[in-house]
Design a protein with these regions (language model features):
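A short linear hydrophobic-aromatic micro-motif
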Residues: 34-41, 76-77
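Amphipathic, hydrophobic secondary-structure cores in small proteins
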Residues: 42-54
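Hydrophobic alpha-helical segments typical of transmembrane helices
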Residues: 25-26, 64
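A cross-domain feature marking catalytic cores of carbohydrate-active enzymes
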Residues: 8, 41, 80
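Short S/T/G/P-rich N-terminal loop/turn motif that feeds into the first structured element of a domain
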Residues: 1-25, 31, 36, 47, ...
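An amphipathic, aromatic/His-enriched active-site/gating alpha helix that lines ligand/cofactor pockets
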Residues: 55-82
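Generic structural signal for isolated residues within well-ordered alpha-helices
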Residues: 28-29, 67
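Short beta-strand-to-loop capping motifs
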Residues: 8-10, 51-56
């Protein structure tokens, strides 16, 4: 499994439909792609939301981003994350 950080921005339309049931639907999108949600946070600043998810790969991350935007109207910027331990191993001299 790979870790992805999904930064979301509300639109004027998507904010009208905020609900706990839509949050559950968003979690179901990730699960249906073979993933899991590690954390969901509301942010103050450039982005409104941050989802930390595990997904099998890049293709599932792309599908998740598109499906969540279709479901919610929220625009997502999805970035892969690499554990520091893996990074340290990769750059070891």
């Amino acid at each position: 499994m790979n870790t992805f950080f999904m930064f979301g921005k509300y639109t004027s339309e998507s904010i009208k439909e905020i609900s706990a049931s839509r949050t559950k639907q968003a979690v179901d999108v990730i699960k249906n792609l073979g993933g899991e949600v590690n954390a969901m946070h509301i942010l103050m600043g450039e982005y409104d939301l941050l989802f930390c998810v595990n997904l099998p790969g890049n293709e599932e991350a792309i599908k998740a981003s598109v499906e969540l935007t279709r479901l919610t109207g929220i625009m997502f910027n999805t970035c892969p994350g690499i554990a520091v331990e893996i990074f340290d191993r990769l750059v070891k001299k």
